[in-house]
């Protein structure tokens, strides 16, 4: 089975329309078992032809999926609770601390599932959140 992760800043501009709102965008995909199958090679070639975009083949797509989920689950959980955009988490300590706690909890869940996430994932994701351009979220 092939898994994939898309990294993009986007919004739903209107029904059935996803708008890329800024910043880089890329896609990472790979076999869940880490193999480089013929099917994955064909998909990679077809994807590049069909989209004009070069995808990234990962031998550890489960890690990629979890590392994105660590950030998304933390930021979306906190912003849903406070009913404010992403930037509010970095502007107010009472929002930032639960965000960091959520990152740590999601990281721990990945580790409990046997996924090898980067050792400094919490620091990487907090730096990413701090560095976001306000127009990108």
PLM-predicted stretches and their roles:
Residues 12, 81-82, 133, 137:
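Short amphipathic alpha-helical interaction/hinge segments
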Residues 8, 47-50, 128-132:
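Alpha-helix boundary/capping residues
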Residues 7, 61, 123:
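Residue-level "edge-of-site" marker
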Residues 1-17:
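Rossmann-like NAD(P)(H) cofactor-binding subdomain of soluble oxidoreductases
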Residues 14-120:
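Internal alpha-helical scaffold of NAD(P)-dependent oxidoreductase catalytic cores
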Residues 110-137:
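C-terminal active-site/capping subdomain that shapes the small-molecule cofactor and substrate pocket
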